Amino acid sequence: MRKEYDVTALGELLIDFTENGSSGQGNPLLEANPGGAPCNVLAMLQKLGRKTAFIGKVGQDLFGSTLRETIEAVGINSEGLVMDKDVHTTLAFVHTF
């Protein structure tokens, strides 16, 4: 059996919304960032020269497309990423103190 990847991760891939300042009316401004521990680890390993792949599911929506493009841009193989029209990509709102 031939090994194609050094590391393959299975798990969550989502959008983290984090505060990035305040509006003129004092409301928090939110920034959308790719998140999910499995792909964070894969991105680091990819930068260290490892060949990586991800298995998971996102919605067939703008956020899901953005996440696919993001992991592909850093070299993570996305053949195992399912884009499902019947679900929405997970959004996490991160509150910092």
Regions found by a protein language model. Give the residues of each.
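Positively charged, low-complexity intrinsically disordered leader regions
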Residues: 1-24
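Short secondary-structure boundary/capping elements
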Residues: 5, 10, 33-40
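Short, glycine/charged-enriched secondary-structure capping and boundary segments
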Residues: 22-25, 68-70
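Short pre-catalytic strand/loop immediately N-terminal to key active-site residues, enriched for Gly-Thr
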Residues: 25-35
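Alpha-helix C-terminal capping segments
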Residues: 33, 40-51, 94-96
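Conserved N-terminal subdomain of the carbohydrate kinase-like
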Residues: 51-97
